[in-house]
Amino acid sequence: MRLGTIARIIKDTYYKGSLKTTYWAASHFMAEVRALWAPGRDAFRGEVGRGLWRFATDAVMPIRGENEQRARAAVDWILRGQSSSPDGGVALGYFPCDDGGAGSGWRVSYPETTGYIITSLLAYAKSGGDTAVADAAMRMAHWEVDVQMPTGAVQGGPVCPPERQTAAAFNTGMVLDGWCSAYVHSGEPRILEAARRAADWLVDDLDEQGYYKTNGAFVSRGEIKTYTCLCAWAIYRFGEISGEERYKQAAIRSIEAALRQQQANGWFAHNCLTRSDAPLTHTIGYTLQGVLEVGLAAGRSDFVDAVRRTLDALLPNMQASGYLPGRFYADWEPAGLSSCLTGSAQLAIVCYRLAGHLGEARYADAADKLVDYLKALQSLRSEDPGCVGAIAGSFPILGAYMRSGYPNWATKYFLDALMLQQARLRT
């Protein structure tokens, strides 16, 4: 990374906000660092230290193969996250230094990501005939029905009592995705009804221009959120299941709106949770997956071309090892000093899917680099069982995104990418 880029990142990260904001961010970071030395954290502290050393010395060696072993480890970690919760959902993640007071390191269940984890686990179960994994996914789907809001929406943030719930379009779309998969698997009318209520709420939430109005309380306000177009894929899927064209047309309208935010160089505006000037690869991945999957399903070559335009601008920033910076400015200069591992996995998924459609191996080759790098960051052996099989939020783990822990969605997308890589190896 160029010195000028590093200076730009430091300036925007530490000197652009108010002094108060910088102070509280630094205080929270130091509290997490101090927590590493709390009793019982020796094993996790060792994981953090080894990761920092590997990052500082560029000592990560990508791993080829081992897909089945690593996919199984990822699934087992997700199931441990479900077992840690009393309700059937999956814990938001494993954060030993900041678990919200739970004491176990595992946070409470998270409806949004439990939703799309259902799809991943059912795909894994189908590929290997694993009924136990499928049963676990269905318990998640039933729990999601139990906590669905009366309006048909899904709450934003970790699960909370009904009186504290606030609706969020993105979260609703991700749970709709899980319900679509659960209905295809089970044929349960109760799940179909929940999915319909969610799909109807999402369609009604679109404004005249095709953007979702209800972003929820956990993201920055006062702007559209381009990445919410991933909901369109779930809406389109429901349209295919129900046989009703109006859902498909609403999904297409949502993607067309998102593409109005794409710049000539492929970068998307208004495309982050909190920093639209420098979106995460995580939210870039959400946007690209939504655009691509609806494009493939609807036969819209212009959607596919838009995804190609972004990838062709973004992928040259990936190192030969598979390391990818976690944020990007509008000129495609890196905007972060750490990697957002969820985003790397998501972009690998998009690359595999695009390669399969276009028949261009260069996209699959890029995906392989991303996935093989992530494999090297997945621990298969640790004295802390909460770390085994998981993918961290950032590399290093003290990096900017979901610091000091393992959000469940990082491991979910890693699992999806592993399954796509394995499918490619079989062809």
Q: Where do the PLM segments sit?
A:
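Glycan-recognition and catalytic cores of secretory/periplasmic carbohydrate-active enzymes
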Residues: M1-T427
